[in-house]
Amino acid sequence: MNIMIALIPALLWGTVPLIITKFGGSTRQQTMGMTLGALTFAVIVFFFTDPVYTLKTVGISFITGCLWTVGQMFQLQAFKIIGVSKAMPISTGMQLVGTTLCGVILFHEWDTTLRIILGFIALALIVGGIFLTSYAEKEEDGTNALKQGLITLFISACGYVGLVVLIQGFKIDGINAILPQAIGMVISALIMTHSGGTEKRFNKRTLLLTIPGVIWAAGNVAMVHANQLVGVATGFSLSQLGVVISTIGGIILLKEKKTQKEMLFVIVGVVLVVLGGILIGVAKGA
């Protein structure tokens, strides 16, 4: 039963890119909708929990919210450039490599021979998976788009990795972070989406896009609960399975075109990224 609960974050987070893309809208509208949805959920959670706020908790959580918006906005741009089925495995892989290396360098997480061996195998699998999922059979069909997408996803990963490093480095409790983090998300989204488009940031579509924001925030709370039930290492590993839903869903539901060879490479690449993520979780608990 605990494992089933621990799979909820992967299920929720895996569907978010599909729902956002299906709902459409500009990157600005999607970013505002997501952050407003997350804030709405955070306010509701506030009344059903007993968070403890300190200046450090509020300040660091607010900054992580700003970093999340950077990560999310650039990831949304990548969806439009190279598609969900290609962007999600690459994005997940970059985040895994980034958080793992920061964990090793800053927090000395690989302190045994076994962890070092498992960690390097995991990184090799993830990097291999990224290369496979980014493969394009016909180079003229999107080499420039892929380069642009990779740069965009790298910036996105920096935002997400920075978030994780701050939360871990300052030992911020998940429940305590939710509301100030969501406030940081909305304020930074308002600033980042202020210019860069002619369409309205707030309309009916923006309201509709709060739904995936609520779903993401629910996955965040579920992750906090899952970590308490099965441990951080197992919870982290299981959360990586969301990329399978996003990738397969992008191909089937969003009808993103792939050649037979590209499809094979994407599937194998996703498997490698997931295995790498699981191995990192094993290394954390070893």
From Swiss-Prot:
Gene3D superfamilies: 1.10.3730.20
Keywords associated with the record: Cell membrane, Membrane, Sugar transport, Transmembrane, Transmembrane helix, Transport
Principal localisation: membrane
InterPro entries with a match to the protein in the record: Sugar_transport
Parts of the chain that traverse the membrane: 4-26, 33-55, 114-136, 149-167, 177-194, 207-226, 230-252, 264-283
Membrane topology, record value: Multi-pass membrane protein
CDD domains xref list: glucose_uptake_GlcU (cd23112)
PANTHER family: TRANSMEMBRANE PROTEIN 144 (PTHR16119:SF17)
Protein name per its UniProtKB record: Putative sugar uptake protein lmo0176
